[in-house]
Regions:
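N-terminal beta1-alpha1 cap of cysteine-dependent amidohydrolase-like domains
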Residues: 21-121
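C-terminal outer-membrane/trafficking sorting elements
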Residues: 354-363, 367-440
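Sec/Tat signal peptide C-region and signal peptidase I cleavage site
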Residues: 15-19
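C-terminal and late-domain segments of enzyme folds
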Residues: 20-63, 174-348
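Glycine/threonine-rich flexible loop motifs
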Residues: 125-135
Length: 440
């Protein structure tokens, strides 16, 4: 039986005096169908949806319920997903979150928990981030990914939010020329704060509409800035507008598109692991990017997108098969350079350190008898802490010790399972941590 998220009233705004913060459109059966989804991720470039990729997405739901999440628009996906593609599903529901309060509404949370597949529509990724990050919505989505292996997909902004690193577009979009001229321009807003947790995309940033306009230069700038700010040699997956990458549970991405009739491609990009000194030569505020390394700073694999998705790329092994070409990318004083390249003779790896932007940290996780919670941006004396079960029950957890910026909690009384960690301070609630209790 699926969990129903009956969060206590203290978690929510009282809706009695407010308009409903969402609009729901249901096609098919309104009740819940319990199936076993197959997992996976569908990343789509942002123009018209690729029908073959969307059929893959629906098949991963295994006949279950499809949920479309968006903050603007209407029900344009409903008939398309329910009947036009010829894949049987139980229902398609679009929920338009018209207010940030929707992220706390019991109906929205229940429907998120019941979905076998969730599709993020295009739109404004900052709207998604600012409305859903650190709320029960993203906590439940991530729990369902981890527990039930639901399938996640999205186009344009809905693709842009799915990497462990992401371009938030908080101040608007940015062109390649602007990002190359100054990787620290106010429009280059990159983030790694916990949002959509896909393990295979943990050290990856995605980019969309990659050929309209050409975004190779800005992606180079993104990767350089991530290294400078986070100490991580991140990787990237980019889709041209009519291309999709559908990633199965083993981490293999099939590339869908219209090749050879149309020039549809996806790119898999990483720093050059063959170099002893791979870091950018100059990535500093107010200056043009230089990441040259003999013209071999970055390796990019271009894969043609076809109707049957026959050309593939293994993300764990960072190797492709089928119709593909390798390129070397570099940047010299803000000028992007592309030349023919070779496949890497090594597997790129990423050093990853906890983000300094995350306000809450937990160790260990999964946990057993004790768990240490600390905050590097909040005074523990001003914070109240809760651990809440999947059923919405607040668990009585005595603090063993209180430190200046954290607690050691006694968790022996908790049964094994998934819990939400919430902290309250200065009128704000943080729900960006999911805890797992293992058997003692």
């Amino acid at each position: 039986m699926k969990p129903v998220f009956l969060f206590l009233l203290s978690f929510f705004i009282s809706y009695a005096s407010y308009a409903q913060p969402y609009v729901s459109y249901i096609t098919g059966n309104a009740g819940d169908m319990i199936t076993s989804p197959k997992g996976g991720i569908c990343l789509m470039g942002g123009a018209t949806e690729d029908d073959h990729a969307m059929r893959w997405f629906l098949q991963q739901a295994n006949g279950g319920d499809i949920l479309v999440l968006r903050t603007t628009g209407s029900n344009g996906y409903n008939n398309y997903l329910y009947s036009d593609l010829g894949i049987d599903v139980h229902s398609v529901e679009t929920i338009v979150c018209t207010s940030p309060a929707a992220a706390y509404h019991p109906y929205v949370l229940q429907r998120v928990a019941e979905a076998e597949a969730i599709w993020f529509a295009g739109g404004d990724q900052w709207s998604y981030i600012s409305n859903w990050r650190n709320t029960p919505v993203d906590s439940i989505i991530n729990t369902m990914i981890a527990q039930r292996h639901i399938t996640i997909g999205g186009t344009s902004a809905g693709m842009a939010i799915q990497g462990g690193f992401y371009f938030s577009a908080q101040n608007g979009t940015v062109t390649s020329s602007t990002a190359l001229a100054n990787p620290y321009h106010s429009l280059v807003t990159l983030d790694s704060s916990h949002f959509i947790a896909q393990d295979v995309l943990r050290n990856i940033i995605t980019d969309t509409h990659f050929d309209n306009p050409d975004r190779k230069g800005r992606l180079m700038s993104f990767l350089a800035k991530i290294y400078e700010d986070y100490g991580v040699f991140a990787k990237a997956i980019a889709c041209e507008e009519y291309t999709a990458v559908c990633i199965d549970s083993a981490g293999t991405g099939r590339v869908f598109g219209g090749w050879p009739a149309t020039d549809d491609n996806a790119y898999f990009v990483s720093s050059n692991c063959e170099l002893s000194q791979p870091a950018p030569e100059n990535c500093t505020p107010g200056q043009a990017l230089t990441w040259l390394r003999g013209g071999m700073a970055v390796k990019a694999c271009r894969i043609r997108g076809t109707a049957n998705g026959a050309n593939t790329f293994s993300i764990p092994n960072w190797q492709g098969t089928g119709n593909l070409s390798w390129f070397h990318w570099s940047a010299n004083n803000g000028v992007f350079i592309e030349q023919a390249g070779t496949a890497p003779q090594c597997i790129p790896t990423a050093q990853h350190f906890p983000s300094a932007k995350s306000p809450v940290h937990v160790y260990p996780n999964p946990f057993d008898k004790q768990v240490f919670v600390y905050t590097d941006k909040m005074d523990a004396s001003t914070v109240s802490i809760r651990i809440v079960s999947l059923q919405g029950q607040i668990m009585p957890i005595p603090a063993l010790d209180v430190f200046e910026n954290g607690w050691m909690l006694n968790t022996q009384s908790l049964a094994p399972g998934i819990y939400f960690l919430s902290l309250f301070t200065n009128g704000e609630m943080y729900t960006n941590q999911i805890l797992q209790k293992v058997s003692e």
